[in-house]
Amino acid sequence: MDEGFHYYHIFIDGAMFNDPGTENFYGSTRQESGIEIPAHDQAFYEERDVPHGNVQEVRFWSKSTNKLRRAFVYTPPTYNKDTKKKYPVLYLQHGWGENEYAWTVQGHANLIMDNLIAEGKIEPFIIVMTYGMTNEGFRPGGGAGAARPAGGARPAAGAAPAGGARPAGPAPAGAPAGGARPAGGAQAARPAGGMGMMLNNGFETVLCDELVPYIDANFRTIAKKESRAMAGLSMGGMETHSITLARPELFGSYGLLSGGTYNADELAGREKPKLIFMSCGSKENPDGVNKAGVDLRAAGYNAVSYVSEGTAHEFLTWRRSLYQMAQLLFKK
């Protein structure tokens, strides 16, 4: 098998089952079996004997959805040592069919950060991860208080179906050819209204008008756009594209991980972001990502294109992308 994290299931007499011998992960809006194939470059996301940060669950009231919502907040190892120090913040979004567990469970975002900080490759910053949709009638992983599955398996963001209907229209540059595909994995039925609800302004309101103020009020953040970034994988990248264009006063750096590209025309007439990071796997649509970077740099933008060699629409692509992007964010 290819390196990295993969979902799978077993068919017995035509029926699909999870493997009872492995841990389940949340993907395709349901629990899936998952397997980790060692990668030649896995040291950057391994658990190592270095100082570790903290991932805590927070609940914030959302007036727009009339409910208590959940987010996970990564704070670096230094956060509780110097109680006067303030930090930049990255808002990091999952893909379709996933939930707010995705980036720390499958993505190992906290371990990537811990290792980068220990090696002195980045200045520490906070990461905030929340559920990226407002379709509360069909919420992957259940509501904010959903129980974890039996046997200790953690509900984790997973991949949306590789099969099934895709959203109409051409694939964004950097997304798989043939249409913008949900974060890739095993086949499952798509819920009504799932992908079609992803780019509504409901989540924009939750993120920009409710979660960002909550984080700034309850954590030691540098509460200005130059110290605030938004990025996401697959659908989360598409949300990032939409929200950063709609709310340029909030975010100073943008990251699209297998989630399309920006172009100079749509960015014209506004202050240039500090960083535009665009990535995908070499088995996706790398030509579009590379061209977008060239075009944006020619137009005067600080744009970086990254292609993960030998990977597709999968978590090894996104782990590598976060590793690369984190080293470019919030540079003085």
What residue spans do the PLM features occupy?
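Non-catalytic cap/lid and distal C-terminal segments of serine-dependent acyl enzymes
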Residues: M1-K332
